[in-house]
Amino acid sequence: LTCYKGYHDTVVCKP
């Protein structure tokens, strides 16, 4: 349930 901005303006979400 943690989301953050990743590479190349993508969004990375983890539990």
Swiss-Prot record:
Q: Does the keyword Oxidoreductase apply?
A: no
Keyword terms: Acetylcholine receptor inhibiting toxin, Ion channel impairing toxin, Neurotoxin, Postsynaptic neurotoxin, Secreted, Toxin
Task: Write out the tissue specificity statement of the associated record.
Answer: Expressed by the venom gland.
Q: Which organism is it from?
A: Pseudonaja textilis
The question of whether Secreted is a record keyword is answered with yes
Choose one Gene Ontology CC annotation of this protein and give it: extracellular region
Family recorded in the similarity comment: Belongs to the three-finger toxin family. Short-chain subfamily. Type III alpha-neurotoxin sub-subfamily.
The entry's function note states:
Binds with high affinity to muscular (alpha-1/CHRNA1) and neuronal (alpha-7/CHRNA7) nicotinic acetylcholine receptor (nAChR) and hinders acetylcholine binding to the receptor, thereby impairing neuromuscular and neuronal transmission.
User: What's the domain of life for this entry?
Assistant: Eukaryota
Q: Name one GO molecular function term.
A: ion channel regulator activity
Name under which the protein is recorded: Short neurotoxin N2
Compartment(s): Secreted
